[in-house]
C-alpha cells in the first residue's frame, strides 16, 4: 500500500464514534472499542458485534453509518438476544427483570444500590457508611488508612547529630 492510499484510508475513518453517551476510539477494532463502553466487556462486545452482523475485527471508525446504527441497536437490546446469566443486572430490585446497563448508568445504579443499603441499615450498608471492607475481607492488618506509625530514622539521625554537636561544644 502506497502512502497516498494510506492517507485515503485514514481520511475515511471516524476517529470518535458515539455510542450510548460515550465517545469510542474509532481506530480500534469493533470488539476493543465496544469494551471501552461502561458495562460492556470483551465477551459482551463479541456477542453484540455478532448480533449486529459486523465483523468484530474491523476498525470501528471504518464502519458505515448504518453498521454503527445496528451496533448501537444491538447494545441497547442486548438482554433480548443474550442469555439471562450474561446480563449485568439480573432480577432488578424495582422491576424484577433482567437488564443490561451500559454507559454512565452503571455507576448511577451502583450508587443508588449502595444508598438503598444504607437507608435500610443492612450490614453491607453500615460497612459502606463506615468505609470498611464489605465483602468479608480481613481487616486486622490490611486496609489500614491512617498514616504509618513507626520509627522515622531520618529524624532520629538529625537529633543525634544535634546532640553530638551540642555535646562536642560543651567539652
UniProtKB/Swiss-Prot annotation:
Domain of life: Archaea
Protein name in the entry: Small ribosomal subunit protein uS13
Underlying gene: rps13
Region (Disordered): 128-171
Keyword Transport among UniProt keywords: no
Function description: Located at the top of the head of the 30S subunit, it contacts several helices of the 16S rRNA. In the 70S ribosome it contacts the 23S rRNA (bridge B1a) and protein L5 of the 50S subunit (bridge B1b), connecting the 2 subunits; these bridges are implicated in subunit movement.
Gene Ontology molecular function terms on file: rRNA binding; structural constituent of ribosome
Family label: Belongs to the universal ribosomal protein uS13 family.
GO biological process: translation
One CC-aspect GO term: small ribosomal subunit
SUPFAM superfamilies in the cross-refs: S13-like H2TH domain
Keywords associated with the record: Ribonucleoprotein, Ribosomal protein, RNA-binding, rRNA-binding
Comp. bias intervals (Acidic residues): 160-171
PROSITE patterns: RIBOSOMAL_S13_1, RIBOSOMAL_S13_2
Subunit annotation: Part of the 30S ribosomal subunit. Forms a loose heterodimer with protein S19. Forms two bridges to the 50S subunit in the 70S ribosome.
Pfam families: Ribosomal_S13 (PF00416)
Amino acid at each position: 500500500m502506497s502512502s497516498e492510499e494510506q492517507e485515503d484510508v485514514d481520511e475515511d475513518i471516524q476517529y470518535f464514534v458515539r455510542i450510548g453517551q460515550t465517545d469510542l476510539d474509532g481506530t480500534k477494532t469493533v470488539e476493543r472499542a465496544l469494551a471501552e463502553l461502561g458495562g460492556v466487556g470483551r465477551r459482551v462486545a463479541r456477542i453484540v458485534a455478532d448480533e449486529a452482523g459486523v465483523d468484530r475485527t474491523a476498525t470501528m471508525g471504518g464502519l458505515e453509518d448504518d453498521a454503527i446504527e445496528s451496533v448501537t441497536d444491538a447494545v441497547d437490546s442486548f438482554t433480548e438476544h443474550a442469555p439471562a446469566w450474561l446480563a449485568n443486572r439480573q432480577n432488578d430490585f424495582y422491576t424484577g427483570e433482567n437488564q443490561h446497563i451500559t454507559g454512565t448508568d452503571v455507576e448511577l445504579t451502583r450508587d443508588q444500590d449502595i444508598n438503598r443499603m444504607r437507608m435500610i441499615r443492612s450490614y453491607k450498608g453500615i460497612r459502606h457508611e463506615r468505609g470498611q471492607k464489605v465483602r468479608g475481607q480481613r481487616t486486622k492488618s490490611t486496609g489500614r488508612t491512617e498514616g504509618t506509625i513507626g520509627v522515622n530514622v531520618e529524624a532520629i539521625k538529625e537529633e543525634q547529630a544535634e546532640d553530638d554537636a551540642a555535646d562536642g561544644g560543651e567539652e
